[in-house]
Amino acid sequence: MALLWGLLALILSCLSSLCSAQFSPVSTMEPLDLQLMDGQAQQKLPPLSLLKLDNQEPGGQIAPKKAPEDCKLSPTPEQTRRLARAMMTFTTDLFSLVAQSSTRPNLILSPLSVALALSHLALGAQNQTLQRLKEVLHADSGPCLPHLLSRLCQDLGPGAFRLAARMYLQKGFPIKEDFLEQSEQLFGAKPMSLTGMKGEDLANINRWVKEATEGKIEDFLSDLPDDTVLLLLNAIHFQGFWRSKFDPNLTQRGAFHLDEQFTVPVDMMQALTYPLHWFLLEQPEIQVAHFPFKNNMSFVVLMPTRFEWNASQVLANLTWDILHQPSLSERPTKVQLPKLHLKYQLDLVATLSQLGLQELFQAPDLRGISDERLVVSSVQHQSALELSEAGVQAAAATSTAMSRMSLSSFIVNRPFLFFILEDSTSLPLFVGSVRNPNPGAQPERKEQQDSPDGKDSFQDHKGLPRGDKPFDPDLKLGPPSEEDYAQPSSPK
């Protein structure tokens, strides 16, 4: 089972010297009950955003442009593919920068949550600010981007995802009605008033976060700027059960190789004949395997065969087309996968600036949100992952395949990257890297004979079933044909 949750925050604050002397009450501020949606009722989450007013002179009053009627239509297959490709490119851009600056051994973040936040902001962005947002998201869908992303998310993993959103506003803050309407329609974010009492507001916000993440994130905010005028919150909760569960009785302590010299002990989930589809990339040589969940999702492992790698190198040439392999068949495989418990929190201001969004934190044009001059002052993100044995028994057809002899092995006992992908579109929901799944343990020097040589996770190429080749023209090692499987003998 994989249990994931994510929260993103943008905050709008108002500089007291530039704000209107007195905001008049806004009647649209109504308390919003917790919205946790699953199945067809689920809605999108906007990340928690913190924005504040800067010292620019107010510009002309520009209402947010209403999206064309075409935006309200269901996305075409081609639009869905283009959006999924764009999201994968954004994901690799974002995670490469985060990995470069992080000193933590394990990372996890939700590019979907970040993209939802930026597309939410795009509802009120104008001119160059809007253009930069679309460029960073690699979006070519024009004004329909928030609508397409919203519709795509509503169709994700029925029963596995719960999405929640909330918006907090300072009483009387002059926000555009169109922005409020579209925020609720596309992201499920209704406005709720801040009381003006910091302690009470913090308690209310953190209580909502705790409920939306089922108690996994507590005390997300420790302070609230005195001049806060707007908070946009979203929470993503994903619970994925393995389509073929791991037997807890087979889980045992194993060695995870940190590098050529040291290992740490870790609980390894195991299966002798696990239905897996995998392939091998070269230059650099990377083993890729899709572990299927129910609800059309997969945990995708990318494991370089050498220790000397960084995320930027691995992701440099990784595209949507490489990971999207719907034609690959599953094969029974000997599998070892470490149990994981990851949590990571970071401020994304520097990373988003490096991606080209410096203007958001200096002088953005957000007059589609309010005629007041706003600037993004903080973007906080937190994600976590728990990986364990629980799953749902495979269907009869899969059980038959699993009864055949395993022809290969996929042993995840060295540093790796991972994605949580939606299978039909390969839309990335979460991305992360694991260099040490047990950072609290004392590394142990390993014996020479225990050192993996970079090939152990697959059988040596000489041992591949007949008909298989180490590399085919598109640099992928596909599963063998049906005739390569050992067939059970007929009972006499």
From Swiss-Prot:
Main location: secreted
Disulfide feature: C71-C144
Tissue: Expressed by the liver and secreted in plasma.
UniProt PTM: Proteolytically cleaved at Pro-31 by both the prolyl endopeptidase FAP form and antiplasmin-cleaving enzyme FAP soluble form to generate mature alpha-2-antiplasmin.
Signal peptide: 1-22
Positions marked as site (Reactive bond for plasmin): R404, M405
PROSITE patterns assigned to the protein according to its UniProt record, in alphabetical order: SERPIN
Residues carrying the site annotation Cleavage: Q40, A41
CDD domains: serpinF2_A2AP
UniProt site positions, description: Reactive bond for chymotrypsin: M405, S406
Keywords associated with the record: Acute phase, Disulfide bond, Glycoprotein, Protease inhibitor, Secreted, Serine protease inhibitor, Signal, Sulfation
Task performed by this protein: Serine protease inhibitor. The major targets of this inhibitor are plasmin and trypsin, but it also inactivates matriptase-3/TMPRSS7 and chymotrypsin.
Protein name in the entry: Alpha-2-antiplasmin
